[in-house]
Amino acid sequence: MGLDFYRRAIELQDKYRKPGMTFENTLQTNGTLLDDEWCEFFKENNFLIGISIDGPRELHDAYRVNKGGEGTFDNVMRGLRLLQKHGVEYNVLTTVNRINADYPLEVYRFHRDEVGTDWMQFIPIVERVDDQGLSLYQEGTEVSERSVQPEQFGRFLTTIFDEWVLNDVGSVFVQTFEAAASNWMGKPSSGLCVFNETCGGALALEHNGDLYSCDHFVEPNYNLGNIADTDMIELVATDQQQKFGQDKLDTLPQQCLDCEVRFACHGECPKNRFTTTADGDPGLNYLCAGYYNFFTHIDHPMKIITSLMQAGRPAAEVMPILAREAADLEAAVAKVGRNHLCPCGSGLKTKKCHGPKRTVEAPLPRRLPVHQAQPRARVVAVSEER
C-alpha cells in the first residue's frame, strides 16, 4: 500500500477526530523494507511497531526466508536498528515453532540483550494440514512439521518464565506472563483474548471492507459483512459475532471445566481446539498439555506477585523472595542424600527433583534447506493423566 496510504489514514483521523478522542496506531512488520522515511513517519505520528523476529540468526532463518530461500535475519536487524535510530517505539513478536522452541533461553536472552526490547510476545505455531501437507481451514487433526509440539511449548514458556521471574520482573514484559498475572489477580480481562473466558473483540478487517470474527478465522463462515454496506458497530453487535465470542466458554469440554488452571487458560484460542479428551470429548486444545504444565509451574511465584501487587508493592519484589527460597532449598538439599525425599515437598527422590544435574549445552541448529520435505504429525487424544 505504501507510505502514502498511511499518510492519508492519519489525515482522515485528524479530520474526523472528535473532542477527547485519541487514536493509537500500531503496525506489525518483519522490518525488511523499512528505511529512514518510514521510520521518520512512524516517529512523527507516534506509531508502535511490532517487529517479527524468531531469535538469533540460526533460529530465525530456519523458516523466515525470502523468495529465493535466503535467510532474512540481516534485513530484519537492519530495519530494527533503523527504528532504534529514529527513536520509534517497538516491541518484538516471536513465532514459536518446532525448532526455536528447543532454545528458549537463547531466544529470550537474544531479544533482551541483543535486540534490546523490553516487551515480547510469543505466538505458538499451530498449522493444520491435509494429507498433502497443504494448509487447511479449521479442519482435521494433522499439523505441519514446523508446528510446535504441546509439551515442547510448555517447556519453552516455563524455561523463559524461570529466567524472567528471577531476574527481569519490572524491567522486561512478556505478554503471556502479564496476562497470567491478571488472571491470578482475578481481573475481568487478562488483556489477551486467548486467555479470557470469552472472546470476539479482536476482529479482522480486510482491505475490501469485509469484516471477520477474528484474525484466526478469516474464512467464509466467519464473514460478518462489509463495512461499505453496514456500519461496523452493527456488524460487531450481530448475533453471529456474539455467539462466536460466547462459544469460547460454552464449547469447553468437561476436562477443561474441571481443570485446576482453567481460570488462567480458559481453553486458550478456539482455533487450536481440535483434539479430544481421554473420554473422547471434542474441543480440547492441541496445546493443553503444555499450558497445563506451564500454568501449574508458575502458580507459586504468581501467588507471590499477586499478594505484592494487592498490597501496593512492586511485583519486582518477587525476585529477592524467590532468591531466598532457592538458597534455603539448596542448603536443605545439600544435607540429604540423593535417594532421600526432596526437601521441596514434591514427594520425589532428591536425585529426581532438586538434586545436582548434569547439563549439556546444545549448539544452535544450522538453517534447514528450504527444499527439505515437511513430514506431518498426527495429533492424538491428550490424556487427563498429567
Regions inferred by a protein language model and the residue ranges of each:
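Basic, glycine-rich polyanion-binding accessory segments appended to enzymes
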Residues: 243-281, 300
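Membrane-interface junctions of multi-pass transporters
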Residues: 218-261
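Canonical radical SAM enzyme core domain
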Residues: 1-59, 66-78, 82, 94-106, ...
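Short cysteine/histidine-rich metal-coordination sites, predominantly Zn2+-binding motifs
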Residues: 272-288, 303-310, 357-372
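Local cysteine-cluster metal-coordination motifs and their immediate loop/turn environment
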Residues: 213-216, 253-271, 290, 341-355
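Acidic/negatively charged segments and metal-coordination signatures
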Residues: 313-386
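Radical SAM enzyme [4Fe-4S]-AdoMet core and its adjacent flexible, acidic
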Residues: 62-74, 81, 85-194, 198, ...
